[in-house]
Amino acid sequence: MAYTTKVNGCAAEKADGVLNGDHNKEKKDPYFVETPYGFQLDLDFVKYVDDIQKGNTIKKLNIQKRRKPSVPCPEVRAIPGHQGVWTSTESLSSSNSDDSKQCPSFLLARSHVTSTPIPRPPAPLETSPTFAVSENRQLLPPPSPQLPRHNLHVTKTLMETRRRLEQERVTMQMAPGDFRRPRLASFGGMGSTSSLPSFVGSANHSSAIHQLQNGYQGNGDYNSYVPAAPTTSSMGSSVRHSPLSSGISTPVTNVSPMHLQHIREQMAIALKRLKELEEQVRTIPVLQVKISVLQEEKRQLASQLKSQRASSQNEACGVRKRSYSAGNASQLELLARARRGGGELYIDYEEEEMESVEQSTQRIQEFRQLTADMQALERKIQDSSCEVASELRENGQCPSRECKSVAVGSDENMNDVVVYHRDLRPCKDTAVGTVTETRNVGISVTEAMLGVITEADKEIELQQQTIEALKEKIYRLEVQLKETTHDREMTKLKQELQAAGSRKKVDKATMAQPLVFSKLVEALVPTRDQMVGSHVDTRESCVGTSVQTSSVGTSCHPDCKNQVVGSELPMNWWVVKERVAMHDQCVGRSVETCDRSVGVEVSVCETGSNTEASGSDLTLLKTNLNLKDVRSIGCGDCSVDVIVCFPKECTSRSMNTEAVGQEEAAVMAVPHTTDQHTSTNLERVDQCTNTEAATLVESCTNTLLSTMDKQTSTQTVEMRTVAIGEGRVRDINPSTKTRSVGVGTVLSGNSEFDRPCAVKTKESGVGQINIQDNYLVGLKMRTIACGPPQLTVGLMGSRRSVGVGNEPVGELPEESPQPRVASGMVTGLDHYIERVQRLLAEQQTLLAENYSELAEAFGEPHSQIGSLNSQLISTLSSINSVMKSASTEELRNSDFQKASLGKTTGNHLEYTCKCGGLRSGGLLNVQPSQPEVEAETAEGKHSRGHEQFPMQGSTLPPVNLTDDQIATGLYVCPNNENTLKSIMKKSDGNKDSNGAKKNLQFIGINGGYETTSSDESSSDGSSSSESDDECDTIGYPPEEEEEEEEKDHDTRGMAEGHHAVNIEGFKSARVEDEVQVPECEPEKEEIRERYELSEKMLSACNLLKYNIKDPKALASKDMRICLNTLQHDWFRVSSQKSAVPAMVGDYIAAFEAVSPDVLRYIINMADGNGNTALHYSVSHSNFQIVKLLLDADVCNVDHQNKAGYTPIMLAALAAVEAEKDMQVVEELFSCGDVNAKASQAGQTALMLAVSHGRIDMVKGLLACGADVNIQDDEGSTALMCASEHGHVEIVKLLLAQPGCNGHLEDNDGSTALSIALEAGHKDIAVLLYAHLNFSKAQSPSTPRLGRKTSPGPTHRGSFD
C-alpha cells in the first residue's frame, strides 16, 4: 500500500512538480501561455508552427536516442488518487509532455492501471462518484489554477533538442520532414464527444513501434502496455502522432506531410472549439437561474425525505454529522469542478454550494437524515472501495519498480539535471498529499451510493442535457437574430430610400403651393379693407365677394348692428360660460325647444292644477318634462317612449314650481338664440343686397379680348408654316387653315366649336313647324340664337323690346307689355334679318368661289336665304311669347361664359350671354309681384340655397339701346368669323347633373340647320326626345314635374347655385296663346324639396365644431366615430356618380350654418386613397357639384391624392359636353395651380390633356397661365407629348405660345422634332422645323396675303 502510494506520488510529482515543489513562487513558466479558458499553450509549439509556416522544415533525423513511450492520459482520471491532476488530451495543457518526462517504468505501470477498469466498467461507476461525474464530463477540463506546469528540465531538454536539430539539418540530406509537438494531441478532443481523443489509440501503437525501431528494450511489463492500444484505439482514429515525436525529449525521426496536415486540422478544430466555448459563455446567466431552480427542487425533495424518515434516524444523524459534512463539502467541490471543466460554463456554483452548506442549517439536516438512512450501505461501499483500491495498488506495484529502473537509465539529461534531484523532495510532499486524496476518495465512494447523491447526479445530467438543448436553442436564436437584424437593416434602407423619394416628390408637388396661398391671402386682405368705400376692388377680386358682403351688411343695418355688437361679444362668452356650468344638464336642445313653444309653456304653468285631468295638458307638459330628462341625460338621443312614462307621474304630482323654473330658464335662453339667428339673417340679407351690384360682365369681356390677342399670334405662326411647306404641305390643311385664321383673328379660338356644330345642324334639317310642336326646349335653344339682341348691353334686339322704357317694370300695367313687345320685335327683327341675309350671302359666295364642290351643294343662295328668313320670323315670334312669360334661365344656361344673374335695384334680372365669341350683359325687365320682393328681402338668399348666385358684389344699371345700337353692337368686329358663320342655338335646356347628352344647333352659312352633339350623342337625335329627359329636375321625378309644370313654375338650376325661373312649365301648345305672366308665379317659386341633415349628422357636426381646434380631442375614440359618420354620409351624398346637386347644396348650407370651420373640414375630408369630394365630382363629370364646391370657397384645389393627382389634373382628362361645364372647369383652373406636378412621374395637367388629345382643356389651361416648357421626370414637355401622339392642332396651339421652346431635350437627348420624325408624323415635323428655323424671319402682316382664299380651308376643315 505504501509503495503504491509512492508510485502515485510519482505521477503527482510529475504533474504537479511546480505547484508542490520549491518552484511554487513562479506563477507562469516561460514556455507556457495560459488561455482564457484554462488551457495552456506551449511556446515551443507556437514557434514550431511558425517555423512550419515560414518553410523552415526539418529533415528526417537519425538520432540514437531512445524514446519514452506515451501513455493515454484520460484513463488516469479513473483512479481516485489522480483527481487533482488533469491529464486529459482535450485540454491545451502540457500533460502529455509531462507524461513523456516520466520514467518508463512508471509509464508502463500507469498503462496497467489504466487498462484495468476497462474490462469491467461497472466497478468504477459504483465505487467512485467522481468517476461517474468524470465519465459524463470528460469534455470539461478542470480550472486553470490546477493545471500542471513544466519545470526547468523542459527548458534544457528543448535547448538540447534544438542544438541537435540544427546539427542534423546541416549533415542530413534526406527529404525534409515535419516537426511534431505533443501539444497537438490536446486538440483532438476539442470537438469530440467521446471520452478519448480521436488519435489516442494510434498513439499507443506508434509509441511501441518507435521503441522497437529505435532499439528500445523494455522490461517484462512492456507486453502489458501494448494491449492497451487496441482497447483505446476503438474509440479514436488510426492516426496518432505520439509525444515521442514531439521533440521535447528527443528529435523526430520520421515526420511526413500527412502529420503536418493533421496538425492543421487539429488547430482548426481547436479554434472552432474555442469559438463554441465563447458562445456557451453567453448562456451562463440562464443556466444560473436554472441551477437555482433545480436547487430549490432538490431542497424540497430532501425536505420530503426528511419528514418521512425523521422519526427513526435522529441518533445516527448525530454520529455522522461531522464526517458527512466534510465529505459533502469535498464532493460538492468535485462536482463543481466537473461541471465547469469546460471553462466557459464556469459559474459561482461552487461558492454558492459551499455557502449554502455552511450557512443553511436546513440543508445540513437534510444531508444528515440521508446519511443516517444509508449507514449500512456506506459500510458496504467502503468495503468495496477498499477492495478496488487494493486491486489497483497490487496492479501498480510491479510497474513501479520498472518505472524507476527505466527512468534511471533511459534519459541521461533528466537524471543529471533535474529529475533525479527533485525526485526526493516532491515524492515526500506528494505522498502526504496522496494520503489526503485517498481519504477524500473513500468519503466520496461512500456518498456515491446514497439515494440523494444518485438523484443529484440525475439532476446534474438533466442540467447538462438542458444546457446542451439551451445551447442549441441559443444558437438557433442567434442565427434568427442575425437574419432578423439583416432584414431590419434592409427594411430600414428601403424605407430611407422611399422616404427620400417621397420627400423629393413632395418637394416637387409643393413648390408651387406657397405661391398660391400667398396670392389668396393678398386678395382677401385688401378686399376687406376697401369694401365699404369702393366697388371697383370688388370687381377685380371675385373670391372675396362673400366676405365683403358681410361687412356691407353691417353698414346697411346700423341699428341692428349696434344692438348685435353690444350684445354678441359679451353674450357669446356668457353663453359659453353658462354652457360649461350646465353642460351636463343641457346642451342646447332645450333652448331650441323653448324657442319653439315659449308661450305654450307659460300658459301651462298658469294652469298647472288642471294637468292631471286633461290629456292635452299632458301633451303640453311633455315639453317641460323633456327638458328635465334631456338635462339629466346630456347629449344622448333618449327615446320618446322613456320620456312618455314620466309625464304621468309628474302631472299627478303637479310640479308647477319646476315648470315655472324651466320656463324662466328657457326665457333666459331665448334672447341668446334669437340674437344668433338674427345676426345670421342679417348677413344673408346683406349678401343678397350685394348680389344686386354685380358688374362681372365687364371683367369677362376683358378676358375674351385678351384671348383674341393670343390667337392672333397663333395665326401669324401658322402663316409662316404655309410659306415654308413643300408641295405636299400645301395640299394639307395647315397651310389653308392658317390663312383662314389670319382673316378672323378675333374668333379663331372659338371657331373650333362652331364649325362642326354648323355642319351637323345642316344635316338634321329641323323645320320651323316641328319646333313649335315640340317642347319649349327647342324654342328656348333658339331664343339663345336670337336672344342677344334683347340684351340691353347691345346684342339682341328682341330682348330689348321686352324692357322698353327707363321706368321700372313694376309701374307698368299688366296688359301693356304684350302689344309693346309685339311692335318692338317687328322693328328689331326686320333690321336684324336683313343684316344676317347679307352676311350669309357673302359667305356662301366666298365659299363657292374657292371650292367648286361646295358650289353645287349651296345651289342658289337667295332661295335658301328666303327659307332662312321664314325660319327666323317663326322662331322669333315664338320666342317673343316665351320671353314675356318666362325668365332667362335657359339663356343663362346656354351661355359660353359663367352666368351672373341677380336682382338689381329696379327689380330687373341681370344676365350675361356670349354669342359668337362676343360677350354681352343686360337687364331683362320682369314684373315680379310685391309678395316675392318682400319674401326675398326678409328671408334672403340663404333660405333658398339653390338660388344663390355664384358671383356677387357688382351691379350694372339698366340701359335701353335702340335698334341701330343693337345692330352695330352685334357686329362690332367686321372680321368676326363666328359672327359671320353662325348664330348659336341650343337644342336642350338641361339644368341638372345627370350627364345627359347635350346637342347644339347652329344656323349655318348655307341657310340650313346643322346639328352637333357630344361624343355620346347621335347625330340624328331630335330636340323633342332630348327635352323629355332633360326636363326632369333634380328634386322631382318626371311624373310629379309634369303636374307641377301645369300648375306653376318651379325653380331650376339648383345644382349651379343660380337664381332660376321656370321656363319649361309651359307646354309648346300654350306658347303662342300665353303671354301674360301670372301673378301667383313668384309666390309658388319657392316650392322645392329640401334636404336636411339627420339628427346623428347634426350632433356630429356640433361635436366637431367644439373640438375642431383641439388636435388631441380629434384623436379621441368618440371623435373618430364622429368623423367616420361625417365622412361616410358626406361621401355618400357628394361623391357618387348619381349624386344630386340639390342635396349637396343643402348639405353645404347646413354645414355652413353650423360653422365655417366645420364646412371647410368636411369638404376637404379625404378617404383612404386621398381623394376628396372634389376629386370624385371631377372624375364623374358632375360639374354642377364642382361648381357648388368651388362656390363654397373653402376647397383645397391643390390637394393631391395618393397617386399624386390634383382635381385640376383629373379635370384635364374629364369629358366636357356643355359649355357651362367648360366654364366650371375654367373656374377650377383659375382657383388652383395649373403647373403643379404629379408625384409619380412629374407630369402636369397640360401634359395629361395633350397626351389624351383634349384640345379644349389645353386651351383652358393655357388661358389660365399653364407653362408650356415644364418638363417631367423624364424631361418630356407638352410639345413632345403632342408630337409623339400626332395631335397637329395641339402642336399648333402650343407653338403659338410666346415662350414655347422647341429646342428642349429630354433625358434621352431627343427633341420634339426628333420625336415627331420617329413617330412618323411628317406634318408635325414640318411645323416644328419651320418654328425652329423661320419663326423670327416672317413678318406679322404675312397672313393677310392670302385673304381671298382664306374662307375655303376653314370651312372645309369644319365639314371634314
Swiss-Prot record:
It is found in: Cytoplasm, Cell cortex; Cell projection, Ruffle membrane; Cytoplasm; Nucleus. Residues 938-947, 985-995 have a biased composition (Basic and acidic residues). A motif (Important for binding to TLN1) lies at residues 41-44. It holds the Pfam family KN_motif. Residues 66-103, 221-253, 929-954, 983-1053, 1337-1360 are annotated as: Disordered. Adapter protein that links structural and signaling protein complexes positioned to guide microtubule and actin cytoskeleton dynamics during cell morphogenesis. At focal adhesions (FAs) rims, organizes cortical microtubule stabilizing complexes (CMSCs) and directly interacts with major FA component TLN1, forming macromolecular assemblies positioned to control microtubule-actin crosstalk at the cell edge. Recruits KIF21A in CMSCs at axonal growth cones and regulates axon guidance by suppressing microtubule growth without inducing microtubule disassembly once it reaches the cell cortex. This is KN motif and ankyrin repeat domains 1. The lineage of its organism: Eukaryota, Metazoa, Chordata, Craniata, Vertebrata.
